[in-house]
């Protein structure tokens, strides 16, 4: 980001920030608000007039420096919206969420409006002829006319609860903040042109963003995502804060309110950082890292730019570990370890990962960003992501040339261990997707976007899934309600886990792993834990010691040793796979090559047929989110114990 020069205050303040960060790394961090008082912010934050992060439409030469193919692609996207209809998000569709649990119909209309506006704005910035201005005006006006900028699933934050939005009480959710950001960037980029249409356009933008976002967030401390009253925070915190910060920096004209707002944003971000595991692990999974750790980076990058580099905590160990998490969770290609509400396949944000790596001076992370850019064909004729996210699109466009010239490097580390999150991953051969890959988790059953999955494992072979974590279906009203664990994808019986005496694992913080151990060496890596406490009393489990081992270049071994207080039903072990299983006899199950993958070899599961009887289930998939990872169907392998002992042990082997 570019800034106009500001008188230097000296190196001392940057050193103070870094030293404060390092000194408090083991306690309550307050990395930002601890050192950055409102008085200090007044000295270092650039004024509204001086902060110039990206070229405006009038700086035509700067926009023409973008790759020609990308410029052409952006203009084509804008042209599709010429004279477009701005579909109205109807009140009856808003009520879908409370009537039938559907959140998708309203979101489709709302998100489409914002994507259209962003596409038109970028097209106008590149072309600069005024051809898209009337459609931009229509987009601004229709969005400003909406009663609520958020989505039906989040309107319950208002005092009158779920249902229709209360126009008298604006509340701030993820997408209200996104909308404020979109309009703020539109005002910044096209301000003079909009004034040429009518000064009332920018006045309307300021009025709506002020009353819906800026004034509300400054006045209220009770939004749970702020964490200011001790609430547990998640990705909502940095996601909203990053967009709120953009709106403050670009639209808040009153200097004291501008500083007050930034100071409050720092306090909110500190609640996120204070609660983050020191190992950098995101318990929401790699998909949500894009709006957890990566949105934290968005915020830190904005603060760095808006202070001429004087706000800089990129050397802090926690910040560095938060960045490195996403590369550690990468398995191969588009596949990632997907515990919790994460999809197995991701198109991770190449630009954010590259820039995060550059800021923390991590060459491997920068190489990963370059790898993703090549994987996604960035710089040829595409740019990644929804155009509704101008806060992500703009920095991506202006780092694109550097990003596409960087040396790509896929992160294929030998193994990793996140001790606080209790997640491990290991591969047969460092630097290669060939051979078997193992990931497993401990943790507890009250994690953010939790599944009841303590002790679950994932196995890949030559970069393709073998034993899987199914992930999550498209969100509905049930997903974040007290009926969440009625959904099959959340249940331990549909993870690679045992059902004991007819009982699945239970949700709650007390249902957790104990005695967790991890050991890695050149020939093997092992992970062990006791999962007994993840089950309710009815399961009558005294101990259930699970050990998973990757013998590099050879096999994965799953070993369970257990003691029960009572045995009423046989143990039933679930193994989930996207590969079609075949019982071949002699305690062997053949897992076929994945559908459509010609170069993948079959994999075999070996079990003691004296201990187990095996059955196979096919699970047809109708949900679009699941189909995007697993195509038309999944398979559930059920191994049922032939005896009901109080003590027992067994081993299951996975081999190529």
Language model segments and positions:
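N-terminal signal peptide c-region/cleavage motif recognized by signal peptidases
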Residues: 18-20
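Structural helix-adjacent loops and short alpha-helical linkers that scaffold large soluble proteins
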Residues: 124-137, 186-210, 248-266, 303-319, ...
């Amino acid at each position: 980001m570019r800034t106009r020069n500001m008188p230097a205050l000296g190196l001392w303040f940057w050193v103070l920030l870094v030293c404060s960060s390092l000194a408090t790394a083991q306690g309550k961090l307050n990395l930002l608000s601890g050192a950055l008082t409102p008085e200090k912010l007044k000295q270092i934050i650039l004024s509204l007039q001086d902060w110039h992060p990206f070229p405006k439409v009038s700086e035509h030469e700067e926009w023409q420096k973008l790759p020609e193919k990308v410029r052409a692609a952006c203009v084509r996207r804008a042209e599709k919206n010429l004279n477009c209809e701005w579909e109205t998000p109807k009140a009856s569709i808003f009520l879908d969420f409370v009537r039938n649990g559907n959140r998708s119909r309203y979101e489709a209309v709302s998100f489409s409006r914002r994507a259209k506006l962003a596409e038109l704005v970028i097209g106008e910035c590149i072309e600069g002829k005024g051809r898209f201005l009337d459609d931009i005006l229509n987009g601004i006006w229709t969005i400003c006319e909406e009663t609520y900028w958020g989505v039906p699933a989040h309107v319950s934050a208002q005092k009158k609860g779920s249902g229709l939005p209360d126009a008298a009480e604006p509340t701030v959710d993820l997408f209200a903040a996104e909308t404020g950001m979109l309009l703020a960037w539109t005002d910044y980029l096209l301000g003079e042109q909009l004034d040429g249409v009518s000064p009332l356009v920018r006045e309307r933008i300021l009025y709506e963003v002020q009353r819906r976002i800026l004034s509300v967030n400054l006045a209220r401390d009770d939004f749970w995502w702020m964490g200011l009253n001790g609430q547990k925070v998640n990705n909502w915190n940095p996601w909203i804060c990053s967009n709120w910060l953009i709106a403050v920096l670009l639209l808040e004209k009153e200097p004291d309110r501008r500083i007050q707002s930034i100071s409050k944003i720092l306090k909110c971000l500190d609640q996120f950082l204070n609660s983050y595991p020191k190992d950098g692990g995101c318990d929401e999974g790699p998909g949500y890292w894009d709006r957890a750790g990566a949105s934290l980076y968005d915020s830190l990058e904005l603060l760095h730019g808006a202070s001429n580099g004087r706000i800089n905590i990129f050397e802090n160990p926690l910040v560095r570990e938060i960045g490195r998490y996403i590369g550690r969770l990468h398995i191969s290609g588009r596949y990632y370890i997907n515990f919790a509400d994460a999809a197995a396949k991701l198109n991770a944000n190449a630009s954010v990962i590259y820039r995060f790596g550059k800021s923390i001076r991590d060459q491997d992370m920068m190489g990963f960003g370059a790898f993703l850019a090549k994987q996604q064909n960035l710089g040829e004729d595409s740019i990644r992501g929804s155009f509704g996210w101008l806060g992500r699109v703009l920095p991506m466009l202006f780092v694109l040339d550097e990003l596409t010239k960087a040396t790509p490097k896929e992160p294929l580390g030998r193994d990793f261990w996140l001790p606080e999150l209790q997640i491990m991953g290991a591969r047969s051969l460092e630097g290669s997707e060939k051979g078997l890959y193992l990931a497993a988790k401990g943790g507890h059953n009250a994690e953010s976007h939790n599944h009841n999955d303590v002790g679950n494992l994932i196995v890949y072979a030559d970069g393709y899934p073998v034993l899987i974590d199914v992930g999550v279906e498209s969100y509905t009203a049930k997903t974040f309600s007290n009926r969440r664990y009625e959904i099959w994808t959340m249940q331990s019986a549909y993870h690679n886990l045992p059902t004991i005496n007819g009982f699945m694992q239970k949700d709650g913080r007390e249902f957790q792993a104990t005695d967790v151990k991890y050991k890695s060496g050149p020939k093997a890596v092992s992970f062990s834990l006791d999962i007994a406490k993840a089950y309710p009393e009815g399961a009558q489990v005294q101990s259930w010691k699970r050990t998973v081992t990757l013998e590099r270049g050879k096999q994965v071994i799953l070993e369970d040793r257990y003691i029960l207080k009572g045995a009423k039903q046989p143990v039933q072990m679930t193994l989930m796979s996207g590969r079609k299983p075949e019982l071949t006899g002699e305690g062997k199950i053949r897992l076929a090559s994945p559908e459509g993958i010609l170069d993948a070899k079959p994999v075999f599961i070996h079990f003691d047929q004296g201990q187990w009887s095996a059955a196979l289930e096919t699970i047809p998939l109708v949900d679009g989110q699941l189909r995007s990872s697993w195509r038309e169907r999944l398979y559930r392998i059920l191994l049922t114990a032939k005896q009901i002992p109080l003590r027992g042990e067994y081993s299951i082997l996975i081999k190529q």
